[in-house]
Design a protein with these regions (language model features):
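Active-site residues of response regulator receiver
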Residues: 11, 56, 84
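A structural micro-motif at secondary-structure boundaries
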Residues: 133-152
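The feature encodes the CheY-like receiver
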Residues: 17, 60, 88
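Two-component/phosphorelay signaling modules centered on CheY-like receiver
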Residues: 14-33
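Acidic, metal-coordinating helix/loop segments flanking the phosphotransfer/catalytic sites
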Residues: 34-52
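C-terminal output helix
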Residues: 104, 108-117
Length: 152
């Protein structure tokens, strides 16, 4: 799936993580990468091309909001959608202020999550931070650059 959007799912709930991966993979537009904790997720985000991150707030090794801040500091520009069991306005504000683009409360309907993922990806593609991979090339429309992955 060369044009599939890479979604990184960082959640310590094995069942939810695997179920989300399975459901997203049914849609040919998505390809998933999985991590059970923040440190593994941050490594995957830094080392691979990731289009969007689904990030649980309650991770075993680090609060998801702190993980989001670290993602942003490391240069990740793509959308981050926080997943949480806490529905208060204060939690939503903390999540968005940590650098998240959206905040989804568990339990959620898959159709709603899919719509939010697609909306975030559409919005990001129109931003100055958008980067598209075309075969061995990386295209940065805002700076009008087409870069060969070999460095040229």
């Amino acid at each position: 799936m060369g044009n599939a959007r890479k979604i990184l799912i960082i959640d310590d709930d094995d069942e939810l993580r695997d179920s989300l991966s399975e459901q997203l993979s049914l849609h040919e537009e998505f390809d998933t990468m999985l991590a059970a904790n923040a440190s593994d997720g941050l490594k995957l985000a830094r080392n691979g091309h990731v289009d969007l991150v689904l990030l649980d707030v309650g991770l075993p090794d680090l609060d998801g909001r702190e993980a989001c801040k670290l993602l942003r500091r490391s240069g990740f520009k793509g959308p981050v959608v926080m997943l949480t069991g806490q529905a208060s306005d204060a939690d939503t504000i903390l999540g968005l202020e940590s650098g998240a683009n959206d905040y989804v409360t568990k339990p959620f309907k898959l159709g709603v999550l899919l719509a939010r993922i697609r909306a975030q990806l559409r919005q990001h593609e129109q931003s100055e931070d958008a980067v598209f991979t075309i075969g061995p090339y990386t295209f940065k429309p805002a700076s009008k650059l087409l870069v060969d992955s070999g460095g040229g």
